[in-house]
């Protein structure tokens, strides 16, 4: 019987293993879904740095799921310590020289990029998910994925997802030219082994008073509306407050990845100039239209913010 040369056997085996690996490799969408599931279901501790063009801050975040309840803690690692703790559906804030308070919330959102909690089924109509390959972050292998809008009205994300456990290791928010606006970057990651005692600690904390949420006004109370929004954005909440005897309307909009708020108030003059301010991912743009000052604050390009403001409609 004729023997098959060893080098050809090795080559065949290599090709077979390569094809199996390719078949098992997750798509970009599957990797993103795995990331959102890992965030809520794994027990882990991360130390990370959040960087903008103006600031760099470091944090430690710990998360554990126990008895169908979620416990989490976020603490600052620079300057005076600030702490946020989560006891299931209650999130409490402790800051120096400020009154502690508690909110009804299912997760800690501060300092964490919005991409970790995004609904990628919903986003798929407005964004493309492109897998770029492999990289290393914090000593761990990561899948690299670009989240690209299908229009020119918003920013993009570059994310690095732990190949083994699905946790987000790094995210870069980039403008349309690829300039970095905001970065989340994990420095150290531990799974399970450093979380002993977290639930005991959180359960012993005396939670501060629960804040009442601002009243969400009925749609019939709204005297204005956004005449144009980028596709996928919708109204999340509308509130009306009185500040120094002046009524100020605010409306929060989101597409599930980026958010912005419109503020509308009366002004005494139509001659006020338009104002624009930008830092990192955040844009502030205001303009007076029909005796109303309309202010945009959010994570969209200036050109988009300006169009949204100028197309506000009043009844």
UniProtKB/Swiss-Prot annotation:
Which GO molecular function annotations are given, in alphabetical order? antisigma factor binding; lipid binding
What Pfam families does UniProt report for this protein, alphabetically? MucB_RseB (PF03888), MucB_RseB_C (PF17188)
Report the domain of life of the source organism. Bacteria
Record text on activity regulation: Binding to RseA is inhibited by LPS fragments; phosphorylated N-acetylglucosamine (GlcNAc) with N-linked acyl chains are minimally necessary to disrupt binding to RseA. Once RseB is no longer bound to RseA the latter is susceptible to DegS degradation. Thus if periplasmic LPS levels increase the sigma-E regulon is induced.
Q: Which UniProt keywords apply?
A: Lipid-binding, Periplasm, Signal, Transcription, Transcription regulation
Where is it found, in Gene Ontology cellular component terms?
Answer: outer membrane-bounded periplasmic space
Signal sequence coordinates: 1-23
Entry function: Negatively modulates the activity of sigma-E (RpoE) by stabilizing RseA under non-stress conditions. Although not essential for association of sigma-E with Rsea it increases their affinity 2- to 3-fold. When bound to RseA it prevents proteolysis by DegS, which is probably relieved by lipopolysaccharide binding (LPS).
**What quaternary structure, including any partners, is listed in this protein's UniProt entry?**
Homodimer. Interacts with RseA.
Q: What's the protein here called?
A: Sigma-E factor regulatory protein RseB
The gene it comes from is rseB
């Amino acid at each position: 019987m004729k023997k098959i040369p060893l080098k050809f056997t090795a080559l065949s085996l290599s090709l077979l293993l390569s094809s199996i690996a390719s078949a098992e490799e997750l798509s970009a969408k599957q990797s993103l879904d795995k990331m959102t599931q890992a965030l809520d279901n794994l027990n882990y501790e991360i130390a990370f740095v959040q960087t903008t063009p103006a600031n760099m801050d470091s944090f430690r975040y710990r998360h554990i799921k126990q008895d169908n309840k979620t416990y989490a803690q976020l603490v600052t690692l620079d300057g005076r310590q600030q702490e946020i703790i989560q006891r299931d559906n209650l999130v409490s804030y402790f800051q120096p020289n400020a009154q502690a308070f508690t909110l009804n919330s299912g997760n800690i959102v501060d300092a964490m990029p919005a991409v970790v909690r995004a609904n990628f089924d919903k986003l798929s109509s407005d964004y493309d998910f492109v897998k770029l390959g492999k990289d290393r972050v914090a000593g761990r292998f990561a899948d690299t994925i670009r989240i690209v809008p299908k229009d020119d009205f918003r920013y993009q994300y570059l994310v690095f997802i732990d190949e083994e456990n699905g946790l987000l290791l790094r995210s870069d928010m980039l403008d349309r030219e690829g300039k970095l606006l905001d970065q989340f970057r994990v420095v150290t990651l531990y799974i399970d082994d450093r979380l002993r005692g977290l639930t005991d600690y959180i359960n012993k904390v005396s939670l501060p008073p629960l804040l009442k949420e601002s009243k969400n006004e009925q749609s019939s109370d709204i005297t204005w509306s956004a005449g144009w929004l980028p596709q996928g954005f919708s109204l999340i909440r509308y509130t009306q407050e009185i500040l120094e005897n002046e009524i100020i309307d605010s409306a929060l909009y989101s597409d599930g990845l980026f958010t912005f708020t419109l503020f509308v108030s009366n002004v005494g003059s139509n001659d006020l100039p338009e104002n624009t301010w930008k830092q990192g991912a955040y844009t502030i743009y205001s303009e007076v239209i029909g005796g109303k000052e309309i202010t945009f604050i959010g994570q969209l390009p200036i050109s988009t913010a300006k169009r949204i403001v100028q197309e506000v409609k009043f009844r």
